[in-house]
């Protein structure tokens, strides 16, 4: 049994929640802290691949973070995650090519754990928190959060109430709908007008050799397009299942595993919506369901060779002799042009052509484009202070709340929320 009152309840055991828990447990050991999650084990980026970026602005929402603030907190993130920073080489060669095309190549301090080793990292982190007195309640779904004159706390499974002095809500990207419901019920103003829509590219390492020099190269193109989440070594494209549709994602195993000679990365376009369409989440769900409908209940994939010739890919010809590798995620072969909005596809294709000039080979006919890859983390509450407080005793943080875009930014957001709680003690 667990106590029905805690000093702090943290909803979500991902990096944002963990960051808050570690900071609170370290600086105020007497606090009673409960972490609750609907999953059995911490989900999100820590479980899937666990790629970490330690250079601002990657992973940080620039509206809520200055360089000085990020650089103050990032060493605290490193203290607990203990990253093995990857080396880079030949960066200037690629950077000079990029600059001639008005493309920016960022120099980022990175670490990569790998999907096969991520559970061990999560277990180490949870064991350390348990040793420090933090309680965990897995496989319990929080259905509401409240903060009123009658008290502060959470509701589990629609019936059971647990009281708290403070509540930190960190449900991650998949919790965006829950977060919106809570904000609407509590009359918390929020903005939801940004969404990232794009494709995931899969090819051989020979066609994208930059990954031998720079594990996750961060290219920023004109028109709001960027590369995101590059995986190599033993890399696979995977499905992310949501209620009513599936999205594309990618991951890789650790360097200890035998490679499969494949590379995958996302090309995402950031879209800021204006009147009359204002909900990035609604647009994302619409585009995802449209693609799944065209794909017969699955996402789509198309070879670059077919795309350049203006014809759809078919299941019968997808693995013919011209193509040097089969898809690691065999979804529906088809025509991306039927599903991707024309303006988005035009900007992504322009970015791909520039990337092929910087790293010749990426537009080999066998290269596969998967769609849709969509990042739904656009909720941005109206924060009351720099600690991400949304009401007297409620804090909202992480990718789902728009304070971060990745593991390190989410962890740093948790630290800032924890600082707010400690500041108010």
Short names for language-model regions:
Residues 1-65, 88-96, 101-425:
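Residues forming the flavin
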